[in-house]
Amino acid sequence: MQQILNDIAAEMALETDRGKVADYIPQLAHVDPNQFGIAVATPDGQVYVAGDASTLFSIQSISKVFTLTIGLGKLGDAIWTHVGREPSGDPFNSITVLEFESGRPRNPFINAGAIAVVDAIMMGHEPKETLGEILRFVHFIADDDSIRFDHKVAASEMDHRDRNAALAHFMKSFGHIKHDVDKVLGVYFHQCAIAMSCEQLARAGLFLVSNGVNQHTGIRVINAQQSRRINSLMMMCGHYDGAGEFAYRVGLPGKSGVGGGILTIAPGKGSIAVWSPGLDHVGNSKLGSKALELLVQKTGWSVFSN
């Protein structure tokens, strides 16, 4: 595995078309696009890394996997009264489908859906309490208490919140948001601003490799059925309106973020985190997607392989 990752990192270093760094969040626009990291964590406790795998980056929408997990843990199937389970086929911040579906988001991995999940898990608590719960959960699944919010990124997103605020207010007008919109958005922007490295992120994804069990502690995070269902949602909805292309080329459940990270799960085999800040036209890491396609070709880890 280490040689495979070394070879992939070397190949990515030669790529000239690295995509475009997200510029609508000013703090992300300053990130050096010439970076690439990859890490694979396996259920036996091994972690293999290559490239800039220890560099911290903003996980952005990858955090939606973690808040959905918290929501399933707290509410069970009742979480699905707040959000659907269907691919949207639209950009992650689109308001179009919301209008047709009476303000109920299509899935928890588009912005509107993730905001609805945050509202659901707040359960009357103040933002500070909910943020503490989210960060403690990430510490637990990654087995790393050093992970923190990047408050500068969160503030940058809050300053440019107009589209997300519109989504939240639209949902609230239909009764799908119960808390104060600014409080919900404050939590949402901070969860997206969690800073992690590829190594930390790969460790954090291991519970989805092992039917919901935290491999660091042996403690169950969610039940096996919930773990399978999160993976299925990652496969269908995890890459914005590029989910079909990712399934076609990589064939694994994954969740991307506009910070350039992708968390990918090979059930029973490994948790893969890749990061390169340059994005393709739908907002997924350009080199990250290429690297994962190479990894699957070299390992045969696609869920569609015999």
Swiss-Prot record:
Enumerate the SUPFAM superfamilies for this protein. beta-lactamase/transpeptidase-like
Recorded superkingdom: Bacteria
Q: Which UniProt keywords apply?
A: Hydrolase
Q: Which GO terms describe its molecular function?
A: glutaminase activity
Question: What general EC class does the enzyme of this chain belong to?
Answer: hydrolase
Q: Which reaction does it catalyse?
A: L-glutamine + H2O = L-glutamate + NH4(+)
Residues binding substrate are S61, N111, E157, N164, Y188, Y240, V258
Task: Provide the E.C. number(s) assigned to this enzyme.
Answer: 3.5.1.2
What is one process in the GO biological process aspect for this record?
glutamine catabolic process
How is the quaternary structure described? Homotetramer.
- Entry's NCBIfam families? Gln_ase, PRK00971.1-1, PRK00971.1-2
Q: Which family does it belong to?
A: Belongs to the glutaminase family.
Q: What is this protein called?
A: Glutaminase
Species this protein is from: Psychrobacter cryohalolentis (strain ATCC BAA-1226 / DSM 17306 / VKM B-2378 / K5)
Highest lineage ranks of the organism?
Answer: Bacteria, Pseudomonadati, Pseudomonadota, Gammaproteobacteria, Moraxellales
The gene name on file is: glsA
